[in-house]
Structure formats: structure tokens, C-alpha cells
Amino acid sequence: MLGGMLALAAAATFGLNSVAIRRGVLSGTVAQGLAVSIPVGMPILLVAALVSGGLGLLKILPASSFLLLAGAGVTHFIIGRYANYRSTKAMGANLVGPVHSSSLIMTLALAIFYLDEVLTPLRVIGIILILGGPLLSLCSPAVRGKTETGASPATFTPKLLEGYGFAILCALAFGASPILIRSALLNIEDTGAGAGIVGGLIAYTAAFSVLILYLLRPKHLRHALEMDRNTAKWFSYTGVFVCISQMLRFMALAVAPVTVVSPIVQSTGVFRTLFGWYINREHEIFDGWVLVGVATTIVGAMALTMSVGSVVDLVDLPDGLATFLRISWP
């Protein structure tokens, strides 16, 4: 019960983060977003590491784990977050969300080759649904720049080429980073919530170091500081929301199985759509095709992360179908 509640809270804050990003990039730039959101997360993780008593792990963490976590930090928080902000600025959180969910496919592919994961029929169905979500969204007249006769033009016109390009880059970065993190944590005995928080702190520190190098140039620092209070507010929200959501996810995984936590966290698309409707209605595209695309991707993500055993135990399936679902490769 506790694990499910923590996972649901993580999904909700991930959704809030997407909405806050959208508001921030309306008036600010991607570089400004990185300059605010990354430093905001560091003190939160430091306090969490102190409270959890996980800082002692720094003494026993192998050098290889430090390098893997640092690589994950640069990949996720610099490359991935930059691409996330660029894609969200170009075409909104609703359209990029299904593409970002395809990062699960990247994670699964890497896990099969490096962490001895397997491919099952249920996961294949999930991959097909995840890939189909963005295609369904493209059927929207508003996305294609068309409106019905007599209808007013959409307030927001997406830049599809830029948006999808950076959304794919974001999915690749977000898909690779969990493998780096998992590989790093496999090198230590304690892989509970404390280890995860310390791993996040190392990853954030590496990303912050790269950010500092970027801001050393005076013109970059001036640009980062040239934002109004409203923009700084929304970017600060993104830093807080994404940091809290990551910690909640690690806490959920510490007290509940992955098969319970991961499908619940994938419901972030529902929260992203709901919060976006209330906060960013004029800056997003909401129509039937887009919502169907979002829903298809969420179902696919849940299928991709659920274990076959949990499905067979939950649903009374015919023996032949249950046997088919248990097929695995390699």
C-alpha cells in the first residue's frame, strides 16, 4: 500500500514537472531552465542524503560506480533535460510526452544486452502501443496545422521537426541513464533508498559541474541571469518537482516490487494531461487524437513494465494464452 502511494505521488509530481517546464519555456530559454533547475535540486538531495544516512556510502562506493553515476548525470540532467526543454518549447508537453515514453524501449533494449533482461510478448505489445501513440497524435488536425471550417486557429502552433527531433534525443538520453544507474548500484551491496539518493546526488553534482563550465563564459552567465521573475519561478518549480519525484520513486522501489511501482509511475501521462488542462490550456493541443495518443502510450508503457507473472496472477487467462505470454527471448 505504501509503495503504491509513493509511486502515485511520484507520477503526480512528474506530471507537474512537465507542466512547469512548459510554462517556463514560454518566456525563458532552455539554457536558463538548466541554469535554475539543476542547482535547485542539489540541496534537496543533499538534505535527503543526510537524513537517510546514505552519505556513508560515499566511502565504499567503487570508482567505477562514481564514473557510471557521473555519466548518468550528464546524460540525463544535461543532454536529456536540454532536449526535454527544447522539445517541450517547440510543440508542448502533450505531444512530446508519448515520444518521451519511448525511452522505455531504449532502456529495455539496453537491459536485454547488458543486464540479462528478456523480451516477452507483453513487452512487444507495449512497444507497439508506445510507437503508435505519437502516430495517432499526428492525426490531429491541430497538429498538422489544419482547423475545421469556421473554427478559430489554434493558439499554439507546434514546430514538429524541431520538437520530434529533440524529443527523440531526450528519449535516448532518458532511456540510457537508468542502465548506467543500475549498473553503478549493482556494484554495492546496499541498493535501498539511501543508495539511490546518494547516487542521485553524485549524478546531480556531475551535471552541475558541466553547467558551471558553461556558465564560466560571461555572456552565458549574463544570459542565464536575464530572465524575469515569472520565468525564474516556473524553472524553480521544475527543479523542485523533478527532484522530489525522483526521490519518491526510489522510496517506492525500496518498499514495493518493481512490477507494482513502474506501471503506477507510468500514469504520469494522465497527470500531465490533467494538470496541463488546468494550467496550460492555451499553450497545449487538446483534442481527441492527441488524447487517444497519450492514452495509447500510457497503456503501452504499463504493458512494457508489468511482469508476465503479475498479469497471469491477476487475470484468469486460458492456459494457451498464459503459456504464450510466458515466452521469453533471449
Describe the role of every protein-language-model region.
Residues 1-32, 36-71, 81-91, 139-168, ...:
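Membrane-interface interhelical linkers
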Residues 7, 200, 262-266:
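Short hydrophobic/aromatic, small-residue-rich stretches within specific transmembrane helices
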Residues 15, 46, 74-78, 104-109, ...:
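Hydrophobic/small/kink-forming positions within alpha-helical transmembrane segments
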Residues 17-22, 84-85, 96, 104, ...:
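Interfacial helix-capping/hinge residues at the ends of transmembrane alpha-helices
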Residues 105-125, 135-137, 141, 270-292:
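C-terminal transmembrane-helix exit sites in multi-pass transporters
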Residues 250-267:
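Short alpha-helical packing/oligomerization segments
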